[in-house]
C-alpha cells in the first residue's frame, strides 16, 4: 500500500456524497472479502466537519497505515493485500490480514487506545463472512470526544464544540506525534 501524498482536494463533502461514499466503501469491502477469505481491516480517519480530505487527514492516515503494518509484523500476521485511496469521505485503507478476526480486532482496539493518534482513527475489522466486529462486542465504551470526556457521538450530535477547536486539537496531536517521530 502506498502512503498518500499530502496534496489533498479540500472538497467540502455533502451528506448525500458522504452516504454514497460509505455505500461504495461497503461494496469494496465485500469484493475484497470474496477475493481474500481472511479478515479485512478497513481504516479511515475521524474527521469532523465537511472537509474530509486535507493535508492533516492524509498525514494522520499515513501514520495509521504505518502503525497497522507494524502491528501485523509484530504479531507475525501476513498482509495478503493492501490498498489506499481517497474518496469523498477522505482517506481509506484496506488490508487483508491472515489472522484470527477476534485477535485482530482486540489488537486494533489496543492500537487505537495506545497510539497518540489512535482517537483519530476508525479501524473496522470485518470477519471473512463480512460481519463487522464492534467495540460493543467487547463491552467497550463508545469513543471519547477529542476535547472532553463525553461520548464523541453525544458531542457531535449536540454540536458541543466549535469545529475550529476540534480541528486545532487534531492538528496539535499530529504535530506532537511528528515532533516525537512516533509511528
From Swiss-Prot:
Q: Which reaction does it catalyse?
A: apo-[citrate lyase ACP] + 2'-(5''-triphospho-alpha-D-ribosyl)-3'-dephospho-CoA = holo-[citrate lyase ACP] + diphosphate
Could you list this entry's UniProt keywords, alphabetically sorted: Nucleotidyltransferase, Transferase
- From the Swiss-Prot or TrEMBL record, what is one GO molecular function term? holo-citrate lyase synthase activity
What Pfam families does the database record attribute to this sequence?
A: CitX
InterPro entries linked: CitX
Q: Among the record's GO biological process terms, what is one? A: prosthetic group biosynthetic process
Give the Enzyme Commission number: 2.7.7.61
Transferase listed as a keyword: yes
- Function, as annotated: Transfers 2-(5''-triphosphoribosyl)-3'-dephosphocoenzyme-A on a serine residue to the apo-acyl carrier protein (gamma chain) of the citrate lyase to yield holo-acyl carrier protein.
Q: Which NCBIfam families match?
A: citrate_citX, PRK01392.1
User: What does the sequence similarity comment in the record state about its family?
Assistant: Belongs to the CitX family.
| Name of the molecule in the record | Apo-citrate lyase phosphoribosyl-dephospho-CoA transferase
Q: Tell me which species this is from.
A: Escherichia coli (strain SMS-3-5 / SECEC)
Gene that produces this protein? citX
Amino acid at each position: 500500500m502506498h502512503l498518500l501524498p499530502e496534496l489533498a482536494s479540500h472538497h467540502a463533502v455533502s451528506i448525500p456524497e458522504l452516504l454514497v461514499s460509505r455505500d461504495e466503501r461497503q461494496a469494496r469491502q465485500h469484493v475484497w472479502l470474496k477475493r481474500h477469505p481472511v479478515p479485512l481491516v478497513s481504516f479511515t480517519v475521524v474527521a469532523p466537519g465537511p472537509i474530509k480530505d486535507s493535508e492533516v487527514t492524509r498525514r494522520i492516515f499515513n501514520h495509521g497505515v504505518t502503525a497497522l503494518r507494524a502491528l501485523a509484523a509484530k504479531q507475525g500476521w501476513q498482509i495478503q493485500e493492501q490498498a489506499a485511496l481517497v474518496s469523498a469521505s477522505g482517506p481509506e485503507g484496506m488490508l487483508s490480514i491472515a489472522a484470527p478476526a477476534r485477535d485482530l480486532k482486540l489488537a486494533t482496539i489496543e492500537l487505537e487506545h495506545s497510539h497518540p493518534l489512535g482517537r483519530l482513527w476508525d479501524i473496522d475489522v470485518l470477519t471473512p463472512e463480512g460481519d463487522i466486529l464492534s467495540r460493543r462486542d467487547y463491552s467497550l465504551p463508545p469513543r471519547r470526544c477529542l476535547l472532553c470526556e463525553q461520548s464523541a457521538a453525544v458531542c457531535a450530535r449536540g454540536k458541543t464544540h466549535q469545529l475550529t477547536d476540534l480541528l486545532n486539537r487534531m492538528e496539535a496531536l499530529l504535530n506532537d506525534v511528528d515532533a516525537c517521530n512516533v509511528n
